[in-house]
Amino acid sequence: MKILVLNAGSSTQKSCLYEIADEAFSTQASQPLWEGKINWTQDRGVAEIEVKTATGATLQESISDDSPQAHLAYMLNTLSDGDTKVIDRLSEIDVVGHRIVHGGEDYRDSVVITEDVKKAIASLSNLAPAHNPVALSGIEAIEKILKDVTQIAVFDTGFHATIPDAAAIYPGPYQWVEQGIRRYGFHGISHQYCSQRAAQILGQDVASGRLITCHLGNGCSLAAIKNGRSIDTTMGFTPLEGLMMGSRSGSVDPGILIYLLRYCDYSVEKLDEILNKASGLKGISGVSSDMREVRKAIAQGNSRAQLAWDIYVHRLRSGIGAMVTSLGGLDALVFTAGVGEHSAEIRQAACEAFGFLGLKLDLQKNQQKPVDEDIATNDSAVRVLVIHTQEDWAIAQHCWQILKN
């Protein structure tokens, strides 16, 4: 079975093609036959396209004066044409899976995409404006390029559907609940994959134990996972709540927003722009939303960069502590995504706060660029794992299961 995965971001479109045996889905992530990525400039008029294959073939091109859907079509044509060809015809693709950031209350399990599903994705775009519209654009592009191929929506909110009401419902008027305003949580595909991979690494049943998964990228969230089910998470009604992030503020006192609107002549649009794109590491440091650049600035004596680091670490530790109380203890702490996987300093800073739980980090292992490894000492009461998140593989798994069922 050939499965194409589309993972749409606010300024990127990542794609992978997997070939998976029809009779059984491997528990180990396999290397895709083909990987493609589109990076758009701010005006989306220029696309930087990168393609690579499992055999080592590569392609890099810049395309301008065309639509994003045309850019996607161009990239997908490299599947069956040129040096990066891995299939004879695009019609060989059996199914296309899409990461959909927000599924709302109605869509929690992965589903075959219909007109009703497309309408729901569109209606939820105001809750995930950077992601749902571009995902919908990708769905519509596939309809034109691959015609009647089955398309499947895999929702980032789905894994968190098991969060109990006490953790999911905000303490506002009950009318909010009736309007669907509640904690949905995000990065669910990543959190679920990492919980399953952690069980494999530790040799345990996925439906046992107490895990906290730390998805730390440009967007950041934590999930408390008990016996394989999400019971709490830091992101909420939108991906803006929770930890300090690259350019997003995370949680702030709502009174600040009222103050800015009432007394500082802020519009809703300006507030939205600031909270999502000019806050977090970028807003505090004045340097970058990229943790690597912030670290470089700290080394050069930049006090604002140091403050950004200190706030980031404080909020990460506080968030982990809150998840520990939801779980009633902790068996394993998992780090994943760009910062979580690659910043030994962040992992060490986070773990230092939890020595009282018996957590002991092996400092040497932590520095050795671990991938899918346990980096706690042998006598640590809490295991500490670094896991390379494989969202695309997880989406392919959902697609395979739906077609088989």
From Swiss-Prot:
InterPro entries hit by this protein: Ac/propionate_kinase, Aliphatic_acid_kin_short-chain, Aliphatic_acid_kinase_CS, ATPase_NBD
- Chain residues that bind ATP: K14, H215, L216, G217, N218, G219, D290, M291, R292, G338, V339, G340, E341, H342
Required cofactors, per record? Answer: Mg(2+); Mn(2+)
Could you give the cofactor binding note from the entry?
Answer: Mg(2+). Can also accept Mn(2+).
**Which keywords does the record carry?**
ATP-binding, Cytoplasm, Kinase, Magnesium, Metal-binding, Nucleotide-binding, Transferase
Q: What Pfam families does the record point to? A: Acetate_kinase
> Might you name a Gene Ontology BP term for this protein?
acetate metabolic process
**Quick one: which residues bind Mg(2+)?**
N7, E391
GO MF annotation, one:
magnesium ion binding
Domain of life of the source: Bacteria
Listed under catalytic activity are: acetate + ATP = acetyl phosphate + ADP
Write out the annotated subcellular location. Answer: Cytoplasm
PANTHER family, per the entry? ACETATE KINASE (PTHR21060), ACETATE KINASE-RELATED (PTHR21060:SF15)
What is the protein name stated in its UniProt record? Acetate kinase
Species in which this protein is naturally found: Nostoc punctiforme (strain ATCC 29133 / PCC 73102)
Question: Which lineage do the record's taxonomy fields give for this organism?
Answer: Bacteria, Bacillati, Cyanobacteriota, Cyanophyceae, Nostocales
Originating gene: ackA
